[in-house]
């Protein structure tokens, strides 16, 4: 269900904005509110002392209410471009994508980055419990600060992408995040504060990793359309979803 929703949701950024920097701002606004939702969902049990069952119940209520409002506003106020009934074969699309070298390069980097992001996600709970000696509350606290600094980082990376190229901004965030993560190798039991600090620094870099790639993808979709005379924005953004998964 989320895949069905996500592909057109991501490609909306391409349809709504044509300006180079405006696409980054649109992507930043979208990811800001996603992170804000994550931030509040992590903060609720810390502030209100909810049990896991209570938290899940309240989050379901909030998701249903805000989702209904959001989808209603989306269908009413977001304009839909006219669709040209032109059939384009899948083989032709894949062949043209193969000949679009900038697109292949970005998708390759995206794939490597997605794999790199999965490893900490899988090992996170084990690292907190068996290396640092933490508990459930420790995990919530680390994630709370991680997403808090991701929120704070979004304006910085958005403005930086205006000063330098988007690809340079993304590269800088990836190298910076990888550099700070190295220090986690030297942590031992009880070094929770140090790990929270590392999480704050890498969380700050997460902002760029969320907002810059979709904006780059929108620009590459324009390039693809100009070069091959075909609008396959939905297909290209579905490739992103596939790579992320």
Task: Locate each region found by the language model.
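Intracellular loop-helix junctions on the cytosolic face of multi-pass helical membrane proteins
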Residues: 5, 9-125, 129-130, 134
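Cytoplasmic membrane-interface "Motif A"-like loop-to-helix N-cap segments
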Residues: 162-176, 225-232
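C-terminal ends and interior cores of transmembrane alpha-helices
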Residues: 175-190
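Helix-to-loop junctions at the C-terminal end of transmembrane segments
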Residues: 152-166
């Amino acid at each position: 269900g989320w895949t069905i929703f996500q592909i057109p949701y991501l490609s909306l950024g391409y349809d709504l904005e044509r300006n180079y920097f405006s696409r980054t701002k649109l992507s930043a606004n979208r990811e800001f509110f996603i992170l804000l939702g994550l931030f509040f969902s992590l903060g609720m049990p810390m502030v209100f002392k909810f049990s896991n069952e209570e938290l899940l119940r309240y989050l379901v209520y909030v998701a249903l209410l805000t989702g209904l409002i959001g989808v209603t506003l989306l269908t009413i106020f977001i304009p839909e471009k006219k669709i040209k009934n032109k059939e384009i074969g899948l083989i032709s699309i894949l062949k043209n994508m193969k000949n679009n070298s900038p697109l292949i390069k970005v998708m390759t980097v995206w794939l490597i980055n997605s794999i790199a992001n999965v490893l900490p996600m899988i090992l996170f709970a084990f690292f907190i419990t068996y290396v640092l000696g933490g508990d459930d509350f420790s995990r919530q606290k680390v994630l709370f600060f991680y997403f808090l600094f991701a929120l704070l980082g979004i304006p910085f990376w958005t403005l930086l992408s205006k000063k330098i190229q988007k690809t340079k901004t993304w590269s800088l965030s990836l190298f910076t995040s990888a550099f700070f993560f190295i220090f986690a190798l030297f942590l031992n039991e009880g070094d929770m504060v140090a790990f929270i600090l590392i999480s704050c620094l890498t969380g700050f870099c997460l902002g760029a990793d969320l907002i810059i790639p979709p904006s780059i993808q929108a620009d590459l979709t324009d390039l693809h359309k100009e070069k091959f005379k075909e609008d396959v924005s939905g297909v290209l953004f579905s490739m992103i979803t596939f790579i992320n998964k």
